[in-house]
Amino acid sequence: METKHEDTHINESILSEAILEDQKKNRIDHMTYLPGMEDIGSEILDQVVTAMKDYDYNTYTAEDVKRALSHTERTPEDFQALLSPAALPFLEEIAQAAQMETRKHFGNSVYMFTPIYIANYCENYCIYCGFNCHNKINRAQLNAEEIEKEMAAIAKTGLQEILILTGESRNKSTVEYIGEACKIARKYFKVIGLEIYPVNSDEYAYLHECGADYVTVFQETYNSDKYETLHLAGHKRIYPYRVNAQERALRGGMRGVGFGALLGLDDFRKDAFATGYHAYLLQRKYPHAEIAFSCPRLRPIINNDRINPMDVHEPQLLQVVCAYRLFMPFASITVSTRECERVRDNLVSIAATKISAGVSTGIGSHVEDIEDKGDDQFEISDGRSVDEVYQALLKHNLQPVMSDYIYV
């Protein structure tokens, strides 16, 4: 298999208003499954959507926040209070409580990993994403030899956990192709995560057999009406199929699943609540599952002038991260390189437990002899190497951990 590179001249980076209007008329129903998509029912989806719609964060008071902080085990209503505007004046107390929970369950440990982007072909039209199919960027896909070179280079840094990412193209990045990448990764790493397009339970089972341990799926926004306006075409347009991806992954034998909304696409408080409540419901249904959260904020991407993000400032980001910790004390929380090193270092000293290092969002960026790399998905704000992040953690009296899994 040869490396494939393509300069996508299919369309201008942003379609004309006339074409957009035409697409609006011809959009498929975002709530109806496409042929081949596994339908596992809507039990959890219905609960999440109902609770999110009923969540009026402006009704919560300082007394509600104090009550939530006083509890040792927190209910969904406590979680709602901690995410409300009324909680902001208590941010210092919330951060202290979150830090205590983090130290109680994780000690000073902070887990390190890095992502590897093996392809950036995409068949979706998500208007906020740098990889979307209409964006005029360089496309690339690594072959097996190049994947192995990249992973060998990453392993030399001392990292033992890898996150494999592709663009959302079943045609270019087939399940079999991703499976081969997992098999290669198993030679070098103890923990393998996937951030790929959602697949069916049997396909997750196959990827698990190939070596994958956990799956992260970003719902982007849980507001189905907003979701419909942001995802104009492609398989990602189907809202319920994406919401149920984590449960299908668990049915397929994955050890853990990750959740995340792209904060800033819609009302961040409602999206943060829906994300946490979704994870909470799955944890209750699958008690063995390892739960993880990511908390990305919308970042600038190539050729994007259509999104006007609802501002999520640093205090609000801290509020979300701490609320996750207090509501789901055993969950892993990752801080994205979308954030600058100051913010990331502060968050891991309080509530986050996982941090990426040596990050590139381009294709084939770890080995110099892989030419014509594909474009990055988004801009990163923390470009520190593995050693630099490692040393920064030590300076904060934290213990960098490469892996705590042993295979026997």
Regions found by a protein language model. Give the residues of each.
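Core AdoMet radical
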Residues: 133-148, 154-250, 255-259, 263-265, ...
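Conserved, mostly hydrophobic/aromatic
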Residues: 98, 126, 164, 217, ...
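Short, charged low-complexity linear segments at domain edges
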Residues: 90-111
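Alpha-helix N-cap and loop-to-helix initiation/capping positions
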Residues: 142, 173, 177, 233-241, ...
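Catalytic cores of alpha/beta
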Residues: 201-207, 266-280, 340-350
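Canonical Radical SAM [4Fe-4S] cluster-binding loop centered on the CxxxCxxC motif
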Residues: 106-146
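Auxiliary Fe-S-binding modules of radical SAM enzymes
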Residues: 1-87, 284-408
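Generic structural signal for well-ordered alpha-helices
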Residues: 114, 151, 178-182, 204, ...
